[in-house]
Amino acid sequence: MGQKINPLGFRLGTTQGHHSLWFSQPKNYSEGLQEDKKIRDCIKNYVQKNMRTSSGIEGIARIEIQKRIDLIQVIIFMGFPKLLIESRPRGIEELQMTLQKEFNCVNRKLNIAVTRIAKPYGNPNILAEFIAGQLKNRVSFRKAMKKAIELTEQADTKGIQIQIAGRIDGKEIARVEWIREGRVPLQTIRAKIDYCSYTVRTIYGILGIKIWIFLDEE
């Protein structure tokens, strides 16, 4: 069996950058890591509660955190920031206040910026949310996969692979189904590949969705 490494960690420092940029003393490192996790969870929960979308897509591609001695800079990359801003005009300020209360930033300023990504459906996280929404609405998994591939074709990607594992369509025996369109060279380090794994709770149990998108070759 081929051992499958996480494509993002495999390419760190070449085509993939870090999502958290900060340094700390070894003894404080675990605290910083937990703080990052809490910040990301808090933002995701807030967006989930306050974003009114029919499709159920939150549209968060990634959250980057940069820390300095007196400042925590959080950049949220979203596919559809308009929806959040329209449903809550002061949403960003509210989110900032919530985070400041949560982490009692007395001596550190917290700053949040929202950036729109150009091609939302070229991002695996947003696609995974789309597929999850379809599966929750009991759309057949093949139909959901094909629709997702159609959406990525509009985003000028060079290849995509989608894998769904679990009790698909409520069958008694769990299985793995996958589909690939175009090229996905996982062994090539200079190939810019975006990856995401996402769990979705359906009435039959939990399904795992994995998406690899081949964006470009450097």
UniProtKB/Swiss-Prot annotation:
Any GO BP = translation
Q: Does the keyword Chloroplast apply?
A: yes
For this protein, the record's Gene3D superfamilies field holds: 3.30.300.20, Ribosomal protein S3, C-terminal domain
State the compartments where it is located: Plastid, Chloroplast
Question: Major location, coarse class?
Answer: plastid
Q: Name one GO cellular component term.
A: chloroplast
Cite the record's note on assembly. Part of the 30S ribosomal subunit.
Protein name in UniProt: Small ribosomal subunit protein uS3c
Spell out the family assignment given in the record's similarity comment: Belongs to the universal ribosomal protein uS3 family.
* Organism this protein belongs to: Solanum tuberosum
According to the entry, every stretch annotated as the KH type-2 domain falls at: 47-118
- Keyword Ribonucleoprotein carried by entry: yes
Please name the CDD domains in this protein's record: KH-II_30S_S3 (cd02412)
GO MF terms listed in the record are:
rRNA binding; structural constituent of ribosome
Q: What is an example of a Pfam family matching this protein?
A: Ribosomal_S3_C
What keywords tag this UniProt record? Chloroplast, Plastid, Ribonucleoprotein, Ribosomal protein, RNA-binding, rRNA-binding
